[in-house]
Structure formats: C-alpha cells, structure tokens
Amino acid sequence: MIGLITGQVQYLMAPTACVMTASGVGYDIELPLPSFCQLRLNEQASIWTHFHVREDAQLLFGFIDRKERDVFRQLIKINGVGAKMALAMLSAMSAAELKMHVEQESETALT
C-alpha cells in the first residue's frame, strides 16, 4: 500500500519510532534500531515501509534499506512471529544474518 516515504524527519521518539512529513502529511513510523540510528532530525530521508493491519491497529513499519524490509516481510510469514517480534529481531541482528538463519531454519539462532 505505502511502499516508500521520502520527506523530512520531524520528530524522533527513542528508541525506535519517528514522525516524518511528506507532502504535508505526518507519518508515525516504527523502525528497527539500525534504521532509527541513521535518521537525523529535520533532515530529508527515504524510508521503505510496510503497512501492517491488525484488528485493533494500523501500523507503519519503516526501514532505511529495502532488503531489511524484505527480511521483515519474510519473518512475519513465520508462524508465531509477529510484526513487533520481527522488528525486535532486526534490531538485534543484521538483515543478512536473519535471512541466512531463516533460510537455514536455524531455530537456536532465532530464539
């Protein structure tokens, strides 16, 4: 639905969220720690997004790197892994490491 947002970072909410404006609209975006650490207040940024709909909420998750978003999408397809858990996993390991562990079905590394 919303694949990429390019705009100005208006507000940073540590540890992993920001408000970003694009074309006069402000977006609340939750990010993994590595992406969050690359953002600078009042600077332009492009964030790859995943729009996540639940019964009780509509959430926007953001990633500086498109590959990181793709790994996030792979993770949430795994039974028992929700969006918040996938975000926490991407905060603890790089997207490349997680992708490798998912492809190898390495349960010990993922728990």
Q: Could you say what each language-model-derived stretch is?
A:
Residues M1-I5:
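Short coil-to-beta-strand transition motifs
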Residues T6, Q10-A109:
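Long, highly charged, low-complexity intrinsically disordered interaction regions
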